[in-house]
Amino acid sequence: MASDQHRPKPRLSLRSSTTIRYGSMSSEHPDGDPSTPQTTSISQRRSYIAVAVLCYINLLNYMDRYTIAGVLLRIQKFFFISDSTSGLLQTVFICSFMFLAPVFGYLGDRYDRKLIMIVGLVMWIVTTLGSSFVRKSHFWVLVATRALVGTGEASYSTIAPTIIGDLFAGSKRTLMISFFYIFIPVGSGLGYIIGATVADATGDWRWALRVSPALGGLGLLLLVFLIPNPPRGASDNGGANMETTSYTEDIKYLLKNRSFVWSSLGVTAMAFVTGALAFWTPTFLSRAQVTQGLKQPCKEEPCDSVDSYIFGAITVVTGVVGVFLGTCISKKLRDRVPNADPLICAVGMLSSSPCFFIAIVLASTSIPATYTFIAIGETLLSLNWAILADILLYVVVPNRRATAEALQIMVCHLLGDAGSPYLIGAISDSLSKYNTTDPSWDFRRLEYSVLLCPFIGVLGGLFFLMTSLYIKEDRKAAELLTSGQTPQPEITTVSESV
């Protein structure tokens, strides 16, 4: 029997072929059997601890991301800035996050993933803490440091899900991924609450930006000592000892993977909606209450933070409930309905859009009704978080997952939440000139701006319906390639080729 070092290794290739759709496993092995699977000595206990640590850091990432939104009114009064300029704070963060995600995706598929995350987390802690010392005359410093914060987060967000994917397989992977993504809404909600609480307690919004870096120091220690670096594809039949391919080949593979493309477009629409609403909802609801005469407008700090508290609590609760429901529904339907996952995502997007539309329209007359429909809409939207991550992991081969995560992040932020907060603010500012005398116009112009979000949500639902048409085929192809087999070519009929 040949020794392992002389055994030929299968290689993923994306060179053009008339028979294979998304790539091939080429091997010189005469019978086509895959190489001996890689094994990993990582215990289940250590794997669970690793997921807990990754969840904790994910929580901190999203806490920091939405702390700014929780104290936005204070920032506007502190720097005397407009809506569009305020939206720029989120846009520059997302832009740096977006453009550097492909870089870290490339590195994550080729180099030590744990080391990359450590470097990124250190950068995030330093820049986040630095942004809290900005002075009133240096708004541009806050903008610059928020951009650098995105650099640190990009390294973590592209790599952490792939490590979970290599520690677990099957339904257990789905469960672990759902735990990881539960902390997106939980962290976001806590960002509003903790940001507003710390700002109220200290009388200075800048102290709110110092909470996440302090907790991040603990996260860094946990990352260094408790996170393993499993072999890529270790949970998927050992990964069949896949060799690294070129970045160009990886991109070609992903662009030919229709489930990945359509689901990425769906994620983009979802990012547009969540990014815009998450950033502007507390400010929007505060202006709605001023219009109804329920409270006085904020002229200078400190501003009333009650809307940040309520919206933060709603985000936490609905996020946990939505992710849990989405995961349970997926596990129950997946075996019977092969395309259940994208269908659940489509239902979540299409049903949440009317809820958000009604909530926006009712804001001028009933705040309780508005909060009710926001809660329903956020629950329906949160059905998608864990499912979307699982879709990417099972339709993409292991040695291209970090690149896939990075490419999806870049696209969804480029066309989604990188521009949506700024776009909403810019539309609101552009409408201000049409009515300069009515005090309620500050609310109305923002209301008309955020009404764009439900329509983008409907578009996202249609993208997920398209994903459902191809998910079964693409998942099977990825499973075959991962196990060292070649996907069977599709039979093309005469009518299809004409």
Curated annotation (Swiss-Prot):
<feature type="transmembrane region" description="Helical">
    <location>
        <begin position="148"/>
        <end position="168"/>
    </location>
</feature>
<feature type="transmembrane region" description="Helical">
    <location>
        <begin position="373"/>
        <end position="393"/>
    </location>
</feature>
<dbReference type="InterPro" id="IPR011701">
    <property type="entry name" value="MFS"/>
</dbReference>
<feature type="transmembrane region" description="Helical">
    <location>
        <begin position="87"/>
        <end position="107"/>
    </location>
</feature>
<keyword id="KW-0445">Lipid transport</keyword>
<feature type="transmembrane region" description="Helical">
    <location>
        <begin position="114"/>
        <end position="134"/>
    </location>
</feature>
<dbReference type="GO" id="GO:0006869">
    <property type="term" value="P:lipid transport"/>
</dbReference>
<dbReference type="InterPro" id="IPR036259">
    <property type="entry name" value="MFS_trans_sf"/>
</dbReference>
<feature type="transmembrane region" description="Helical">
    <location>
        <begin position="451"/>
        <end position="471"/>
    </location>
</feature>
<keyword id="KW-1133">Transmembrane helix</keyword>
<feature type="transmembrane region" description="Helical">
    <location>
        <begin position="175"/>
        <end position="195"/>
    </location>
</feature>
<feature type="transmembrane region" description="Helical">
    <location>
        <begin position="49"/>
        <end position="71"/>
    </location>
</feature>
<dbReference type="Pfam" id="PF07690">
    <property type="entry name" value="MFS_1"/>
</dbReference>
<feature type="transmembrane region" description="Helical">
    <location>
        <begin position="309"/>
        <end position="329"/>
    </location>
</feature>
<protein>
    <recommendedName>
        <fullName>Protein spinster homolog 3</fullName>
    </recommendedName>
</protein>
<dbReference type="GO" id="GO:0016020">
    <property type="term" value="C:membrane"/>
</dbReference>
<keyword id="KW-0813">Transport</keyword>
<dbReference type="InterPro" id="IPR044770">
    <property type="entry name" value="MFS_spinster-like"/>
</dbReference>
<dbReference type="InterPro" id="IPR020846">
    <property type="entry name" value="MFS_dom"/>
</dbReference>
<comment type="similarity">
    <text>Belongs to the major facilitator superfamily. Spinster (TC 2.A.1.49) family.</text>
</comment>
<feature type="transmembrane region" description="Helical">
    <location>
        <begin position="207"/>
        <end position="227"/>
    </location>
</feature>
<keyword id="KW-0812">Transmembrane</keyword>
<keyword id="KW-0472">Membrane</keyword>
<comment type="function">
    <text>Sphingolipid transporter.</text>
</comment>
<feature type="transmembrane region" description="Helical">
    <location>
        <begin position="343"/>
        <end position="363"/>
    </location>
</feature>
<feature type="transmembrane region" description="Helical">
    <location>
        <begin position="407"/>
        <end position="427"/>
    </location>
</feature>
<feature type="transmembrane region" description="Helical">
    <location>
        <begin position="260"/>
        <end position="280"/>
    </location>
</feature>
<dbReference type="GO" id="GO:0022857">
    <property type="term" value="F:transmembrane transporter activity"/>
</dbReference>
